Amino acid sequence: MHSLQRKVLRTICPDQKGLIARITNICYKHELNIVQNNEFVDHRTGRFFMRTELEGIFNDATLLADLDSALPEGSIRELNPAGRRRVVILVTKEAHCLGDLLMKANYGGLDVDIAAVIGNHETLRTLVERFDIPFELVNHEGLSREEHDQRMGDAIAAHDPDYVVLAKYMRVLTPEFVARFPNKIINIHHSFLPAFIGARPYHQAYERGVKIIGATAHYVNDNLDEGPIIMQDVIHVDHTYTAEDMMRAGRDVEKNVLSRALYQVLAQRVFVYGNRTIIL
């Protein structure tokens, strides 16, 4: 006797009347129970997005073939198991984002399997190994950016992760590296993009006398800090904050934004279309 499975069906297609009925009727035909369903129409682009969480006994090939015959030309659909995903985390020396992810993964705040943490410095090895997670060093010294990214990419690929998380990984990635993991690399940026791109963002913010500081979690593409935005948040500051005060406050925002973004990504709620995301 087959046990029930739970899977997530994600659909992107040109908008037409009756799409929800077509998709749900096919699920009914396959005797699948719809646990949750969310949809959105982007009227500007004429695109329909739908996330459907299903439970039942699946014949993936037949289900997808039936969907293909019912959906308009140019449709994208994917069916993946619901639940726990695998990630590899990349780090340099800063511990706040990594530590938050390790704690949440260990105590149930994130339903994730951290396959490994890989760094270009040894600084965070002790922290990682306290959680019985492998730490791997891929030293960048003496290597070109391309050579180092090749070694780093090979180390990541050995773990076959669903996503790669940059937890304050302070290296600019080559286009070749990004191309190996399309729409799978998630970065936390230390400002409310597009403001204060580059180094020393909190010092830039202090010099400008800003009244809010924030953080942005986004997918990585070939343009530095310009990939599709997943999550953002800000906190209010005032003239009494030094650059160091802003940095401390900013670290709290960074770790919260990264974990919230990762929560949505792991649940397969984030759709990438162009340089935007839709979260269902």
Regions found by a protein language model. Give the residues of each.
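Short glycine-/aliphatic-rich beta-strand segments at the starts of folded cytosolic domains
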Residues: 2-14
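Short, surface-exposed ligand-recognition loops at beta-strand->loop->(often short) alpha-helix junctions
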Residues: 11-19, 57-58, 91
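Short amphipathic alpha-helix segments
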Residues: 16-36
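One-carbon transfer enzymes
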Residues: 40-280
